[in-house]
């Protein structure tokens, strides 16, 4: 993954002016994965069973180059009233030169696991497993180095065939997830620890051409990072060794964060010409004090996509819905209202092996914020199109 950053510093409260110096960097994340396992099917009580034993290794390495800094023609500050981002002289006075820095940090994860699929009775199946994980983070400057060993995360599930076309299931999964958020003193928060429960019903219709699933879930977690605000609703920053603010937001470990919700999905073919994909989900998340958690995620989302095909041609259109989100508290609270986005698709199949397809996202070029913060906003993607060709060998 590659990422390039260009930054303009924010408004200076002391001078009442904007600093228009410029800074640039780029970074890349390299990932390597290895997963080796052995599957051993066997028969017990005249029913097929399976045991899987394996191990996994993952290394994620962050590399970064700094290009240094400069400032724009006209000085390094401008009066706030005179600043016009649409008419700026963007000539850089001092060339920005690349400063190779190399690897900043790496994260290594190793795990061993064993799992099984068991056919207990004709209508009843079970899945179960356990994973033992090791996690290590190492930075070049030695800051934040930490390691967790022999973390055990089991899971278990039951599937029961209620009728020929219906099955019900329940599942349990334990959660262990290291995180990179820091408290106000600059210490990394402990890993997220928790449990996940889910139950649902799945059905098949029209000879298996149309599938539907309804599920409810509950997730209980501790040590979940929650952003820290002062009594005025202003973001609290991580302090350096001298007690001064850094640019990094501070977090605290919220206990008893509970998320619960419901999901409904329908997908498949209605007949030889029409296809349908529909999904709706709703969840609520609060900490032990009853305060909303993850308020920048829509509590309700829905998507509908209808597809029509006639011989070689096929076309589709859809609508996505995202409920309102917010960030912050009090006077610094920022809201984004409900959001609707339309998409469309058109394709042509030249023969059984060769086809082409045009996808258009955000069909009506809706202007919206995809991410919100107390002092920053992220624009959502404008209307965009992708033309692809597919060939099967």
What annotation goes with each model-predicted range?
Residues 2-11, 18-19, 57-77, 138-142, ...:
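Outer-membrane beta-barrel and related beta-rich outer-membrane complex signature
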Residues 122-123, 251-330, 345, 349-355, ...:
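Gram-negative outer-membrane beta-barrel transporters
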Residues 29-31, 48-60, 101-221, 269-271, ...:
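Structural signature of Gram-negative outer-membrane beta-barrels, strongest in the C-terminal barrel
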Residues 1-8, 168, 193-269, 276, ...:
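Membrane-embedded beta-barrel scaffold of Gram-negative outer-membrane proteins
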Residues 1-55, 59, 211:
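Outer-membrane beta-barrel domain signature, strongest for Gram-negative TonB-dependent receptors
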Residues 11-18, 65-101, 226-251:
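Surface-exposed loop/turn segments flanking beta-strands in extracellular/periplasmic regions
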Residues 200, 379-393:
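Outer-membrane beta-barrel "beta-signal"
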